[in-house]
Structures are given as structure tokens and as C-alpha cells.
Amino acid sequence: MPLSRLIINDFRNITTCDIQLSPGFNFVIGPNGSGKTSVLEAIYLLGHGRSFKSSLTGRIIRNDCDELFIHGRFTTPELFELPIGINKQRDGTTEVKIGGESGQKLAQLAKVLPLQLIHPEGFELVTDGPKFRRAFIDWGVFHVEPAFYDAWSRVKRLTKQRNALLKTANSYRELSYWDLELAQLSEKIDQWRVDYINHISEATQQICQAFLPEYDIKLSYYRGWDRETPYAELLKKNFERDKQLGYTVGGPNKADLRIKVAGTPVEDVLSRGQLKLMVCALRLAQGQHLTEATGKQCIYLIDDFASELDSHRRQLLAQYLKQTKAQVFISSITAEQIADMHDDESKMFEIEHGKIAQG
């Protein structure tokens, strides 16, 4: 469902704004420091409960204010409005409302508002550590497998408990009871991840062929331990080593998605502009699979659209985004950079010093 309305209060340099949105393309135009990224950041906060720019709540609440508030409205397929909102206070308190009901969990907010973010720091998905690619995989599994969230939360708790027990256990018998459940859930999570990567690999490669036809890009999934070894067996076999180290070496918390060109990691082959298109291909493939699997559309947030992309590559990306028929929010310094994407159904907003007006 696309957002039909967005209200922002006391977020960053934005005192207040209340805008009606297009179900298609929404452009936020303004000079550096004007607050255009803050609009996208507010939408991200509404769907994730956190900022993609700062982990400190105090830094995203407007100066001299005690709290921020972000409110959104959807128009459902049945044509009734569903309100959602998030309130954050300087003391760290967070309140989430869905359909007017308080006390909702952030995971429920994420289910209602599936978001894909493409921003200048987004190269981390392919260039940095495995945790970013695990988060990428798990975003997709979370949205298509209802049992994933609880299972993964349980695995993380069990692993933490196991690591604590490793410091005091004298024999493996003291861990065997906990390891039984940990192994069963870990194998289940692994299978969900395998299925998910299998589903999006073909779509990713097709989009990469359009964006980067000169490269044959391959995805491969590493589950976090040897493919031939059951996890229960690994936990037992590695007990002495894990005890010596003080933590569990292998497991689903070590999974990774390996992205290569002719056997070489993509970050060693592609330019920054090409890496951005690679990230876009992954995000678009995720959105495509979400729609195919659930009927939902994700919302795309693209900060600094022109960054690292020449006009030809911008046109390619814009073409694919239009084909998705998803709602898209794009920030840009000038209207000229997005002129060929603007149509009768899109909306353009101009922002300066935190004040927003429809262009």
C-alpha cells in the first residue's frame, strides 16, 4: 500500500510538515543541508523505528524539543484509511501506533510498511562485512515467512545463553539440552534463507544484465558452517574450541551472501557507479519477489538519486522503478536531475531550511 499522507513534527530541522503524496513518484528537491534527506529519513523511521543516519535519538529530535512524531496514512485496497505513527522522546521512549492502537511492536510496523533504501552509503551492502548482507537476506525472509521473526529472535537468545554457559560448563552435557533447540531452529532458518536466495537470484541476474550487461554476476549463499555437517553435530564437535574462545564459532549468525564476477568479489571489479547499480538490482529484485510472494508493494527511498550515476544509468534505474509500479521517494539537489522522470501523476516538493512546499 502506498502512503497517501505524511506528517512530520520536530524531526531534524523540520518543525512541521503535512503533505499529500503520489502513489507513484515523489521528488524532494533542495540544496545540501535543506532537509531533503530528512524527509526520506522520517519515512524510514516510520517503517523501521530507527534512523538510517544516526543511532542516537537525541540527534534526530529538533533542537529544544523533547520529542518527535511521524505519522503516515495508507489507502487500503478496500479504500479505507489506515493510520500509522511513531513517537520518540529524548529519554529513549518509543510509542508505535497502528490503526489508532498503541503498544504495537516495531516488527509489526515493518510488516505494514516494507521499505527499500538506496543511499550514498549503501555500498556497504556489497563492500562491507557479512552482517549487512545477512540483514538484506533476513529483510526478505521476514516479509515472506511469518514464523521467521520469532525463530530468529529465539536463536539469538539461545546463542547468547550458550556463550554464557561456555564460560562455566565442564562438559558438553551441560549444553546439550539447549543445543538441541538451537540446532533445530538454526537448520530451519538456514532453509528459509536458501529458499529466499534461490527465489531472488534469477531476478537479480536479469536486472544486472540490463544494468551491467558486460558482467556475469553470480550470487552464492554461505550458511555460516559447513554445508555437509548438521548443526547439532558441529556444536558438539566444536565444544572444546568454543569453550576456549568463549563464544560459538559457527552458525546462522555467520551467514553471508557472496557476490562475484568470474570468481572475484564485485567490490574488486566494479566502479562506484556500477556498484550502486548492483545494489539497486538487489533491492529491486527483493521488491519484485515481495510482490510475487505476498501481493504487497514495497516503497523505495532513494537519497541523492544522481550520486555516482551518469544520465544513461539514471534513465535505466528510473525505467525499472516505473515498471515496478511501486511508490518511490527520490531526493535530488536540482529538478533538472530528475526532469525526465516527472509526469502528470508524480509530485514534486521543494524544501529549504526545513520548510516544504509542493512545486
From Swiss-Prot:
Question: What would be an example GO MF term here?
Answer: single-stranded DNA binding
Is rRNA-binding tagged as a keyword? no
Q: Which residues form a coiled coil?
A: none
Signal peptide per UniProt: none
Q: Where in the cell is it found?
A: Cytoplasm
**Gene3D superfamilies in alphabetical order:** P-loop containing nucleotide triphosphate hydrolases (3.40.50.300), RecF/RecN/SMC, N-terminal domain (1.20.1050.90)
User: What PROSITE patterns does its record include?
Assistant: RECF_1, RECF_2
GO biological process terms, semicolon-separated: DNA replication; DNA synthesis involved in DNA repair; double-strand break repair; SOS response
Q: Keywords on this record?
A: ATP-binding, Cytoplasm, DNA damage, DNA repair, DNA replication, DNA-binding, Nucleotide-binding, SOS response
Locate the residues binding ATP: 30-37
Record's keyword annotation contains Thylakoid: no
> Gene Ontology terms, cellular component aspect?
cytoplasm
- Family assignment? Belongs to the RecF family.
Q: What does this protein do?
A: The RecF protein is involved in DNA metabolism; it is required for DNA replication and normal SOS inducibility. RecF binds preferentially to single-stranded, linear DNA. It also seems to bind ATP.
What PANTHER family does this protein's entry cite? Answer: DNA REPLICATION AND REPAIR PROTEIN RECF
What's this protein's name?
A: DNA replication and repair protein RecF
Organism of derivation:
Aliivibrio fischeri (strain MJ11) (Vibrio fischeri)
Organism lineage reads as:
Bacteria, Pseudomonadati, Pseudomonadota, Gammaproteobacteria, Vibrionales
Gene name per UniProt: recF
